[in-house]
């Protein structure tokens, strides 16, 4: 599938990895719906990018909100060919801490946004993609999810986050198999330490120390590098049902 003239929804598209992906896809001729809870940032980015970008204020875990983002893509641009799930939240809380056991409400919220929200967008996007005409290779769409290296080597205090991202890893292959009959591919990227709004808000010395943890290149990953992998996945039809670590060979320590 080519990016040019294809229609994409990017969740979490107003900042970080999502915004980097939106910028690259628009630059290569894609038509984008930026789906995010941050209205100000999303509207600003859409205005900056012009006619080939729209913003939808979106709570990915809410069916009506998620469906509205998908419907905007179809009504504004005539269909849907790609979904990139970047929306997510981070939480740090130990299973048993000084104040007692991990709050169940906070665990559920991380799962709801990161895992349930991703699946919610996948199922609704797949429905829209399946209605489209296939290309010459029989392909109707591609879905790219965002997991994390925490799915494989989660640190102390990351039980909820690692569980949510591990769920994304675990559902990648079965969903790819489910959607193969519809000509829809499903892939997952598991990023390491990247330049996100949260990390860029840390002191420079902390950012530098985190970057040095990466074997090579010894720095934080850049949103444009994540976006470049998304583009390659879109354009390479044999990539399906797999998880790619994008992490500079880092393996996280326990804490």
Label for each model-derived stretch:
Residues 89-108, 127, 131-137, 157-160, ...:
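Conserved mid-core segment of classical short-chain dehydrogenase/reductases
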């Amino acid at each position: 599938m080519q990016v040019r003239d294809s229609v994409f929804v990017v969740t979490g598209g107003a900042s970080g990895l999502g915004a980097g992906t939106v910028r690259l896809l628009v630059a290569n001729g894609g038509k984008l719906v930026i789906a995010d809870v941050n209205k100000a940032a999303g509207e600003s980015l859409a205005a900056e990018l012009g006619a080939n970008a729209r913003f939808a204020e979106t709570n990915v875990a809410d069916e009506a909100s998620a469906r509205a983002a998908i419907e905007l893509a179809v009504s504004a641009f005539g269909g849907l060919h790609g979904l990139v799930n970047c929306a997510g939240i981070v939480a740090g809380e130990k299973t048993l801490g000084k104040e007692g056991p991990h709050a169940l409400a906070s665990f559920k919220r991380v799962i709801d946004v990161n895992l349930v929200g991703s699946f919610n967008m996948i199922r609704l996007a797949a429905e829209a993609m399946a209605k489209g005409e296939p290309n010459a290779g029989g392909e109707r769409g591609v879905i790219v999810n965002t997991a994390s290296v925490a799915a494989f080597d989660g640190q102390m205090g990351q039980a909820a986050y690692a569980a949510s991202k591990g769920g994304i890893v675990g559902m990648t292959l079965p969903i790819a198999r489910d959607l193969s009959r519809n000509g829809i591919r499903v892939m997952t990227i598991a990023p390491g330490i990247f330049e996100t709004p949260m990390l860029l808000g840390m002191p420079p010395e902390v950012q530098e120390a985190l970057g040095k943890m990466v074997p090579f290149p010894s720095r934080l990953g850049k949103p444009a590098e994540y976006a470049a992998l998304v583009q390659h996945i879109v354009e390479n039809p044999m990539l399906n049902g797999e998880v790619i670590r994008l992490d500079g060979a880092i393996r996280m320590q326990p804490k």
